[in-house]
Curated annotation (Swiss-Prot):
Gene Ontology MF terms in the entry: rRNA binding; structural constituent of ribosome
Annotated function: One of the primary rRNA binding proteins, it binds directly to 16S rRNA central domain where it helps coordinate assembly of the platform of the 30S subunit.
Entry coiled-coil feature ranges: none
Keywords: Ribonucleoprotein, Ribosomal protein, RNA-binding, rRNA-binding
The protein, known as: Small ribosomal subunit protein uS8
Record keyword RNA-binding present: yes
Subunit and partners: Part of the 30S ribosomal subunit. Contacts proteins S5 and S12.
Record carries keyword rRNA-binding: yes
The organism of origin for this protein: Beijerinckia indica subsp. indica (strain ATCC 9039 / DSM 1715 / NCIMB 8712)
Family: Belongs to the universal ribosomal protein uS8 family.
NCBIfam families reported in the protein's UniProt record: PRK00136.1
This protein's encoding gene: rpsH
One GO BP: translation
Length: 132
């Protein structure tokens, strides 16, 4: 089945797996998904991920989810910019998530990064998702 929003699909798989207290979840691979997973790993929301390459140019990620005292580290993960409604922001209007306790993941001309890194680099871009 074709997926119209691959990033939204990955975020939903993570959300559903954490509700079921799964240790790992698989999702099809792409460069954008890899960059978002890199940010989630750097910020401490997931343990890590591994890539499995298939011969026909396809790949799959296995994401290791993170828990603290039996509860998911990711309390909320939500897609902001969607295929039907893109959301862009300037550097001075980058939204704060949960009063600075969460992060926004932003696709900028300098790459995919967390909101605080985008402010430091003085770049805006497309707000992909927010994590708390």
């Amino acid at each position: 089945m074709a997926v119209n929003d691959p990033l939204g699909d990955m975020l939903t798989r993570i959300r559903n797996a954490q509700m079921r207290r799964k240790g790992k979840v698989q999702t099809p691979g792409s460069r954008l998904r890899a960059h978002v997973l890199d940010v989630l790993q750097e910020e401490g929301y997931i343990r890590g991920y591994s890539t499995t390459e298939y011969g026909n140019g396809r790949s799959e990620f296995e994401i290791e989810l993170k828990y603290f005292d039996g509860l998911p580290v990711i309390r909320e993960i939500q897609r902001v910019s969607k295929p039907g409604r893109r959301v862009y922001t300037a550097v001075n209007a980058i939204p704060r998530v949960a009063n600075g306790l969460g992060i926004s993941i932003i696709s900028t001309p300098k790459g995919v990064m967390a909101d605080h890194a985008a402010r430091e680099a003085n770049v805006g871009g497309e707000v992909l998702c927010k994590v708390f």
